[in-house]
A protein has these predicted regions:
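N-terminal mitochondrial targeting presequence
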Residues: 1-41, 498
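N-terminal Rossmann-like FAD-binding beta1-loop-alpha1 element of flavoenzymes
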Residues: 42-65, 191-199
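Dinucleotide-binding/catalytic capping subdomain of oxidoreductase cores
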Residues: 66-70, 92, 192-355, 427-439, ...
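N-terminal Rossmann-like dinucleotide/flavin-binding domain of flavoprotein oxidoreductases
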Residues: 75-131, 280-305, 311
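Short hydrophobic core segments
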Residues: 129-137, 183-185, 357-367
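Glycine-rich dinucleotide-binding loop and its adjacent helix/turn
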Residues: 141-226, 382-392
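FAD-site-proximal beta/loop scaffold in flavoenzymes
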Residues: 153-171, 321-324, 341-407
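C-terminal, flexible cofactor-proximal segment of oxidoreductases
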Residues: 396-498
Length: 498
């Protein structure tokens, strides 16, 4: 028999002949679940989105002795990759293949349908594991804080995105798309995703969406949509826009649409471009060309035939959402006109001028917020993050964070990958220095799954998820789609537990 040598940076563990036969078989995957050694560092990750999986991936690759469990509130993994990435960006979802390899690694287990903070506490996880990593993302919405934001026809972008992407708690959203004009507040990538989807029922583009994993109810609603004009509003100027050039280029080239810009929003921009970093310069030049230059013959013809329009509106902040008389239905949004002041950083200042924009749909895309899942944890309610230093949670030894709960909802998936790797490196440094004591025997998932059973919670394993995955892909094949997502937790559990 060959005996494994498990190396870390400073320690050597040998599975020797003096151990019993049963101990020699620990670390082998049986029936889709890993059986682990009691003497190895045990780590659990809370959340199975990019932050959680990238942290797990780095730990498993860098520490051949670490044993890792991932806990997820929903029965299905992958978080924002499944529920946040736009359906017309399928290439971004390819990262799921890498995450699947991590989840199926012999030293990793996945436990879905476990609500940490309700089904099991952070302290209980700390008792069972040497280290706990919080990677549960940002489930809350930043509110506008203006009168009328609770009117019918006003939605958070997170909920709208969740609706067309199949997030279970958003399936009943049923947004009213019977109006002509929609206003999106915020100018990040999510705002532009929403704009593209709203303008989708056009010629061949709706046919393209039919080949994605957008949910069937959303596809049917969009096919009947009356939205013909989308305005994307930001409180600062073109040089401060938060989206990337890829998303702007997609808007410029969106079939059946034409841009509708205000030239005044771009006054003086050309003169300062020489001092702007190259990526920002290229993005701004594309906006300038779209807004100010006379299009060529082919582009002019395309714009003339367009039945829908979109445009950025800069230097505007929401003041109030207005209702139709004697109803609670949105009829317009009142915007304050801003000017920019530079005092170390660029900020928008009210001018006192306001304007009303007639619309029946308002979507607020001004940011997500992380939520506190355990009162024993520190939390910065203003920034909506867990206070940390390189992923080490303040005043909470052995507990770390990664992803948006660490940094706030910023950047793209690659940004989350880097910050998650940083957290994993911090943990490994602490293991090596002794700041994180991994010498004590910990029970890991053995005690947690027993505790959950006693509380009537039945976790979903990765093998169970693969049953759900199989059902979704088969349903999708029948419709010419990569998958047709199950839309309720009940449906998911029914499939997983059969």
């Amino acid at each position: 028999m060959n005996y494994k040598l498990l190396f870390s940076h400073r320690k050597l563990w040998t599975l020797g002949r003096r151990r019993s036969t049963s101990r020699l078989h620990e670390g082998i995957r049986v029936s889709g679940q890993a059986l682990f050694s009691s003497c190895s560092p045990k780590v659990c990750v809370v959340g199975s989105g990019p932050g959680g999986f990238y942290t797990a991936q780095h730990l498993i690759k860098a520490r051949p002795d670490v044993e890792l469990d991932i806990y997820e509130r929903l029965p299905v993994p992958f978080g924002l990759v499944r529920f946040g990435v736009a359906p017309d960006h399928p290439e971004v979802k390819n990262v799921i293949n890498t995450f699947t390899q991590t989840a199926k690694h012999s030293r990793c287990n996945f436990y879905g349908n476990v609500n940490v903070g309700r089904d099991v506490t952070i302290n209980e996880l700390k008792e069972a594991y040497h280290a706990v990593v919080l990677s549960y993302g940002a489930e809350g919405n930043r509110t506008m804080g203006v009168p009328g934001e609770d009117l019918a026809g006003v939605y958070a972008a997170k909920d709208f995105v969740g609706w067309y992407n199949g997030l279970p708690n958003c399936r009943e959203l049923n947004p009213d798309l019977s109006c002509e004009t929609a206003v999106i507040l915020g100018q990040g990538n999510v705002a532009l995703d929403v704009a593209r989807i709203l303008l989708a029922p056009i010629n061949d583009y709706i046919l393209f969406l039919q080949s994605t994993d957008i949910t069937q109810p959303a596809l049917e609603a969009l096919a009947q949509s009356q939205v013909r004009r989308v305005l994307i509003v930001g409180r600062r100027g073109p040089l401060q826009i938060a989206c990337t050039i890829k998303e702007i280029r997609e808007m410029v080239n969106l079939p059946g649409t034409k841009p509708e810009m205000l030239p005044a929003d771009f006054e003086g921009i050309s003169e300062v471009l020489k001092d702007v970093p190259r990526p920002r310069k290229r993005l701004t030049e594309l906006m300038l060309k779209t807004a100010l230059e006379t299009p060529g013959e082919k582009e002019l013809e395309r714009r003339k035939s367009a039945s829908r329009s979109w445009g950025f509106r800069f230097f505007r902040s929401p003041v109030e959402v207005l209702a139709e008389p004697r109803t609670n239905k949105t009829s317009a949004i009142r915007l304050a006109v801003n000017r920019l002041e530079v005092e170390g950083f660029t900020r928008a200042v009210l001018t006192g001028e306001v304007e009303d924009v007639t619309c029946g749909l308002v979507i607020s895309s001004i940011g997500y917020r992380s939520l506190l899942i355990d009162p024993g944890l520190p939390f910065d309610s203003r920034k909506a993050i867990i206070p940390n230093s390189m992923g080490r949670i303040q005043h909470t030894p052995g507990v770390y964070c990664s992803g948006w709960v660490k940094t706030g909802p910023t950047g793209v998936i690659a940004t989350t990958m880097n910050n998650s790797f940083d957290t994993a490196r911090s943990m490994m440094e602490d293991m090596d220095s002794g700041a994180l004591d991994v010498s004590a025997v910990k029970s890991g998932s053995q005690s947690i799954t027993a505790l959950l059973r006693g509380r009537g919670v039945k976790p979903v394993t990765f093998a169970d998820w693969e049953k759900i995955d199989s059902v979704e892909t088969k349903k999708g094949e029948a419709e010419g789609k990569p998958r047709e997502k199950l839309l309720s937790v009940e449906e998911m559990l029914q499939v997983a537990q059969t």
